[in-house]
Structure formats: structure tokens, C-alpha cells
Amino acid sequence: MRRHPQLYEVNARIFLNRLSSTAGHRVTLSTIPDQAWLELAEKGFDLVWLMGAWQRSSAARQRALSLPGLRHEYDSVLPGWSEDDVAGSPYAIYSYSLDPPLGETTELAGLRDRLNRLGMGLILDFVPNHLALDHPWVYARPQLFLAGREEGRHLHPDWFFSPDGNAPIAHGRDPYFPPWTDTAQVNFYSAELRDALVQELLAIAGMADGVRCDMAMLGLNQVFQRTWGDVLAEPSMPGIEFWDEAIGRVRARNPSFIFIAEAYWGLEQTLQGLGFDFTYDKAFYDCLRFCGASEVRSHLSSPDFNLSKGVRFIENHDEPRVAAVFG
């Protein structure tokens, strides 16, 4: 792979829905026409990020249908939408198995092999900070999630939910926004939780060439402490960072496995130091969108972090379409 690979994001569900509509029958990962991938290879892309491949949550979907703010958003982006159009968030993961509408989980390794033959690699999502609020672990292994001190729960009752009337569990969140109420927050201070996440990563490494890690900085000890300090029951943080442990264990078996971090808040260099191959360069996007040429040049000459490891983009699923922003 090139030192500076080109990454192409594909919304898995939309992509397959369009192919199925064109073909007049259901298309799954293994029946995607070769031409679809050839076109990307011929355009010079090295990696395909299949966004939203994992099984979504029925409870998260119901939450997505019930929130007035989200329904207003649907009206804006898809006038005339129906409930069948709402699949729920791809980042409230019920299981690290292929979402059934996309095919069978075994098709992922087959897709990776097809892409490899064309000189490309497959990138899949990994969401370390939280799982769907109805994930099986919520009921079978609740100790993996953040329960917090009772005083903290009284202080922030909207941060917690009680699955089926059981002990409270926190919703996933970052320190600057309200919680994601379709999720359950994992406890990064738990050795058992860390091992469980590493096992998921090792399984993904058998199906893909790398992972794009959602909100990767939320797994840092200091960030977890800052986010949850009001409610944490554990008196002290672990002696090792989760990412140092996780990346080391995965690379011991899969030395070339790629780790890409969605990262903000000036923590890109920290994550690179823990083993990430690439980290988001959101500052570059913001310079392009809101500043002038001199600011862009200044950013590109900054010593703040290794620019060769920056992921630069002009759009992704979190940002407006490029034509709407840059014309």
C-alpha cells in the first residue's frame, strides 16, 4: 500500500439499496458487480471504508423514530420519508456481525479478498466507546458497562437508563454534548471490558484490512476521566491506555492491520503515539471551509502532529456534501 493511501467511504446500506434497485433484485456484498469495485480501483483508491456494515439495533431504531428532532432532520434530508427508510444509527451496534439486509457475515471476508485482488483494502467501523442500548452484553455482562456512583446518577439522571428495570447503565456520551440515548457506555477502566473489545477487534481483523475507530479519543484514560469524573466509581485510572493494549494485541497477530482514528481536540498526536496509523485532520477541513489560503498553508506546516498520518477529507457522513459547501 502507498505511504499516502486514498480512502473511499461507502455507505453500505445506501450503496446496496441503489444496486438492488438498478438490478431489480436483492444485491448483497458477495453479489456486487465487479464493475463497481473496478471503477474505484481505476480512480486510484487504495482503501474502501464500508461504513455501517454491522448489525443495527431494533431498540435504537425505535429511539430514532421517536425523537422529534430526528424526525425534523428526516423531513429536511428526505422529504416524504417513511418509517421503512429509518434503519437506526450505524454507531449503535447490536452485534459485530454483518447487518442482515447486507448479506451474511461470511461475505465480508470474501469482499476483502475481492478488493485485495484489485489492489485495495477493506476498512470497517469499530465503535469502542459504546454499544447499542439493547446489546446482548447489557443483559448478560452488565459489569462491562458504566454504572457509576449513586450520587452521580442523581446528579445527572438523564445520562442513565435501566434496561428492563435492571441496574442503571450510562448512555454513551462525550464531554461536550448530551448523551447518545440509543447507546450504552462501556467502562474503559474495566480489564474485562478491554479484553472483550480486543476480542471483537481480533474477529474483525479476520474479515478486513483495518478499522476506522469512531471517536477514538474517548477511550483515552484522561478523556474518560474528564467525561465521567462526576459519576465514576473507580478511584484511579488504569496504568496503561486502552489503545496501547488493544493495538498491541491485534498487531501481534496481524502486523499489517490498519488503525484509523476519528480524532478531535488536539489529541491526534497522542493517538498516533499509541499506534494509530492515521488520525483525522479535522483542522484541515475547517481551514478549507472557514479560512483562507494562508491559514491552510500554516496548518500544513504545523509541527503539532505527524502530517503524513493525517486523514484529510472534503466530506464524510458527518459533514455536509462537498457541493453544498464548496460549490
Residue ranges and their predicted role:
Residues 1-327:
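Active-site and adjacent substrate-binding regions of carbohydrate-active enzymes
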